[in-house]
């Protein structure tokens, strides 16, 4: 059992996006990862896929997601469930920030382009809380 202060976790800044890894293999989450992300208004994640399921809880904001060439609208208090290897993207269609909590069913998570090329993530080597 471990209690972590989310305020002590490193924030990774990407264009249009703030990322914080709440749980992963480096701090006790052996079989899954939990990410908190804030996507700026009119910004998005890259189109990507991974070899695991992903469940996203929308905490605030609204937007749309693309999943395997289909488009879905969503807003706060909704949950998005992506099967493993589905090509997807989260888009903030509003002006306000979109805040999401993502749980991914593997650790570490390997993120790939839709063509299967690995996307290096700045938090891949995040061991700030030690093992």
Stretches found by the model and what they are:
Residues 53-54, 58-63:
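Glycine- and acidic-residue-biased ligand/ion/polar-headgroup-sensing regions
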Residues 51-52, 70, 86-87, 96, ...:
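A generic "binding-loop/recognition-motif" signal
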Residues 47, 65-66, 82, 88-95, ...:
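Short beta-strand His + acidic residue motifs that chelate non-heme Fe in jelly-roll/DSBH
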Residues 34-36, 81, 96-111:
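A short hydrophobic beta-strand segment most commonly corresponding to one strand
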């Amino acid at each position: 059992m471990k209690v972590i202060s989310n305020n002590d976790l490193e924030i990774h800044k990407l264009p249009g996006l703030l990322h914080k890894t709440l749980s992963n293999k480096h701090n006790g989450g052996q079989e899954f990862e939990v990410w908190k992300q804030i996507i700026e208004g009119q910004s998005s994640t890259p189109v990507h896929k991974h070899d695991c399921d992903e469940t996203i809880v929308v905490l605030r904001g609204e937007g749309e997601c693309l999943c395997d060439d289909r488009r879905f609208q969503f807003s706060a208090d909704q949950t998005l469930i992506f099967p493993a290897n589905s090509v997807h993207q989260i888009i903030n269609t509003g002006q306000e920030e979109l805040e999401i909590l993502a749980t991914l069913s593997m650790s570490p998570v390997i993120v790939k382009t839709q063509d299967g090329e690995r996307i290096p993530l700045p938090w891949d080597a995040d061991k700030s809380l030690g093992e």
